[in-house]
Structures are given as structure tokens and as C-alpha cells.
UniProtKB/Swiss-Prot annotation:
Bias type Basic residues, positions: 1-10
Organism (species): Rattus norvegicus
Pfam family of the protein (one): DUF5569
Modified residues (Phosphoserine): 39, 158
Record keywords, A-Z: Phosphoprotein
Biased composition annotated in UniProt, kind: Basic and acidic residues: 16-27
Disulphide linkage map: none
Chain segments carrying region Disordered: 1-30, 92-114, 197-305
Record protein name field: Uncharacterized protein C10orf62 homolog
Amino acid sequence: MLWAQRKKRKATTETTEDKPAESHRPNDSWIKSHFSRLSEEKLPAYRRVSSCGYSPEGKHGEANTTLHVDTVTTKHGEGGVALHRDSFASKQKISGTSVSKEMQRESGKSPSMENDTWAAVAACTKEIDAKGHHVANSVLQRSPEYHRTGHAESRNISPEDLKALEEVELKLKGNFLTHRETVVAGANQAHTVYNQSHHGNQSHQNHNTYPCHQNNQSRSVHYQGHHPSHLSHQGYPSYSSHQNHPGHPSQQGHSSHSNQQGHLGLSSQQGHPSQSSHQSHQGQPGHPNHQSHSLVNRRNQIYDS
């Protein structure tokens, strides 16, 4: 009897112990389902946050965009239709929240401007060449040897005709070199003002010289080859009156400029070794030699001779 009660009591205790276990199972499943549902709800949001999390890093990065633009312009002129092409490069850089844009011309000088300059050179060259042909034909027509043999030599041509042909040649070369200097000065963003005065007016007050004209020395030597008396103008490095400024050559030997002018009977400048008209260079240190400043005047002197 006691054994049966003990067995029954043991069975009831086992059932009471099993009930809480069974009651915890639904709770466990409910908790698991709840957190799984929350995890499923938060997972897309987390994915969105994680995907958006790269955007600030992308903002701190850099993005470069280069855009090439070609502009073609049609110009109607006397020679027909001319096409001018301009190339531009537009660069856009994005760094964080700042956006910088840069546009630059791919060519250093505008092709249209360069074409116009060389068109003017070609027109002048054509005109001078026609004049040279006219002078040459007139010389040949006056040569008796040309009528006999159909050939003429320089020794059979009069000095006046040879001088006329030489003037045409010098004018052709001088015009070409002057326009070439203008093109080079424009490409280097420099400015040169030529003083085209004639006899007795050799002032250089308007002659503003800037750097990047060192190649003009060889051009002045070209004209010095025709007149030996101008060779004394070659060996002097500078004509700037900067005696009190270091780094500038002295103008003690400027009297050689009077030798060139004395060849044609012009006013001498020997009494003025340091002219005040060159004081416009005081604010510009380190000016290179610029011997082409008398190129135009010398060409005028050649014509007048």
C-alpha cells in the first residue's frame, strides 16, 4: 500500500516536473520565432545601412572626368571657305563635397589666329614676289645678251638693276621675319613695340622688351651680313642702362650704336653712353639681349640708301 502511494506520488512529481518543461518549450519557440522575425526585419535595414555605409567612403574618394570638345568654325573670305578648328579639354574633379572644373585649350596658340597671321604673310610674299618678277623681267628685256643667247649673267646687269633686285629680296625677307617675330612673340605671350621712325629719330622709349626674345640675335646678324659696317653691333651683350643694378650688363660700349648710324650720316650717340630713354627697364630684372630693336630702322635705312 505504501509502495503504491509512493509510486503514485512519484508519478505525480514526474508529471509536475514535465509540465514546466513542456510549458518552456512553447516559450522557447516563441522567443526563437520572435528574434528570428526581428532579425529578418532588421536584416534588410542592416543591408541598406551597410550599402549606404560605402557612400561616405565614396564621397571621400575622387572622381575625375575629362571631356574633349572640338569647335569647327567656317569663315567665308576672298579665298573661299576656310575652316578653323579649336580643341578644348574640360576636366571635372570631384573630391568629397567640392567640385572643381578646369577648361584649357589643347593648343598653346589659337589655330585661327595663327592661320590669319600666316595668311597675311602669304599675301605680302605674293605681292613682293610679283614685284620681283616684274623687276627681273624688265632687267632681262634691257639686256642685249639675253636677246641674243636667251641667258643673262650678273656681270652683264647694271648695278642699279642689281640694287633694285636686292631691295626686293631684302624687303621679302624682312617682311617674312617681322611677321615671324610677331607669331613667336604672340605664342610666348610677349609684347614687342617696334619703332619705325626714319632718319634722326632713334628713340627707344616705346620699345618694351620682355623675356623669350633671345632668338632675335640671329635674325639681326642676317642683316648684318649685307652691310659689314653693322657687324660692330653684334659683339655687345646688352643696351640697357642698368649700371647701378646688379645682374644687368653695363652700357659702356653703347658707342658702337653710333658706328652703325654714322654709316648713313645720321646723328651720333657717342656722347650719351647711358640714355634715359632706356629707364623703362628698371622694374624688369634679368632682361636678355635683344638686338633686333634696330632691325626695322636698319631696313628703312637700307631702302633710303
